[in-house]
């Protein structure tokens, strides 16, 4: 019953419930709701982010932030593009390992193959997270 809601339903304008609602968003894999659900689920799978020791990764593009988290059991890499433009970038100082993608703003064709440097791309405001088991680090 709408009369018992804490706040009134938005029934006019571009955000009205007839246009944007949870039931409809759940049907569309590319919806903002699914994006938030994916981020929340991935974040809960990797509690190291935010609490584990970390270091910034050296990147040749000022628009990209790279962070490396490390615990006794696994390592995590996160990259975020703070520019509205797509970027290609090179990151240095990443340990050689088999890295698995765990979160991204879209599907990317390139893979994280580590040597002394790593070359990747990100869409405008894009993000990519990778992880590896610590036993895989070389």
Predicted features along the sequence, with ranges:
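Surface-exposed loop/edge segments in extracytoplasmic proteins
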Residues: 109-111
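C-terminal beta-strand-rich structural cap/linker in extracellular carbohydrate-active enzymes
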Residues: 113-138
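Loop/helix patches that line or flank the sugar-binding groove of alpha-linked glycan CAZymes
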Residues: 1-76, 82-88, 93
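Active-site beta-strand/loop signature of hydrolases that rely on acidic residues for catalysis
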Residues: 80-81, 125
């Amino acid at each position: 019953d709408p009369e018992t809601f804490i706040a009134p339903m938005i029934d006019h304008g571009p955000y009205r419930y007839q246009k944007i609602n949870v039931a409809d968003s759940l049907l569309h894999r590319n919806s903002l709701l699914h994006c938030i659900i994916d981020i929340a689920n991935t974040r809960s799978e990797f509690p190291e982010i935010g609490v584990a020791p970390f270091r910034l990764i050296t990147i040749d593009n000022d628009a990209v932030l790279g962070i490396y988290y490390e615990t006794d059991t696994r390592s995590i890499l996160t990259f975020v593009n703070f520019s509205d433009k797509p970027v290609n970038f090179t990151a240095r100082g990443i340990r050689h390992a088999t890295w698995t993608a765990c979160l991204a703003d879209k599907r990317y064709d390139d893979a994280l193959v580590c040597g002394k440097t790593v070359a990747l791309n990100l869409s405008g405001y894009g993000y990519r997270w990778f992880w590896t088991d610590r036993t895989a680090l070389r």
